[in-house]
Design a protein with these regions (language model features):
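An N-terminally biased module of ancient metal coordination in phosphate/nucleic-acid-related enzymes
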Residues: 1-67
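Extended substrate/RNA-proximal surfaces in nucleic-acid metabolism proteins
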Residues: 2, 54-158
């Protein structure tokens, strides 16, 4: 059996995401393109995962480690992802987002209604090391892998 999947997808919650990149739009585009599965992996957060459950959606996040390596972290359930997200939030610097510079970090429901804005800047490195990431993700029943292997920044080899 062949499954067409995208396991590294951002929504409007991520600072790099456009405001039109809502979970609803991501799911519908994935359906139009014939995907069977997607993983919503916003930067250091899983707050938009609940809004994207109409396709097989793997809850996850793209975690920026203390070494500034980006890892895709995937979890078996939304509850596990939320618990890991709480763990990550405790390990992030308390820097307030500046929407005029980084854009809004939008949280939506499954119908794309805006239900909030993340105030803490999500594009910063956490205090979690690469080694701690693997152990922590595993403790929540998840798996992780490098989001970028050989890029000029935020990758395993840079």
């Amino acid at each position: 059996m062949i499954i067409k999947a995208d396991l590294h997808m951002h929504t409007c919650l991520s600072p790099c995401g456009d405001d039109d990149m809502t979970p609803y739009n991501a799911v519908n585009l994935a359906k139009l393109l014939g995907y069977d599965m997607i993983a919503v992996t916003d930067h250091n957060s899983c707050l938009n995962c609940p809004a994207a459950v109409r396709l097989v959606v793997v809850p996850g996040m793209e975690l920026c480690t203390a070494e500034e390596i980006h890892n895709v972290c995937l979890f078996p359930s939304l509850d596990a992802a939320k618990e890991f997200s709480d763990f990550v939030y405790d390990k992030m610097p308390d820097i307030i987002n500046r929407p005029e510079i980084f854009g809004e970090q939008i949280i939506t429901d499954e119908k794309d209604n805006i239900i909030g804005y993340e105030k803490r800047l999500l594009t910063v490195a956490s205090d979690i090391t690469e080694g701690e990431t693997v152990k922590a993700v595993s403790s929540y029943g998840g798996v992780c892998f490098p989001a970028h292997i050989d890029r000029s920044s935020y990758s395993l080899l840079s």
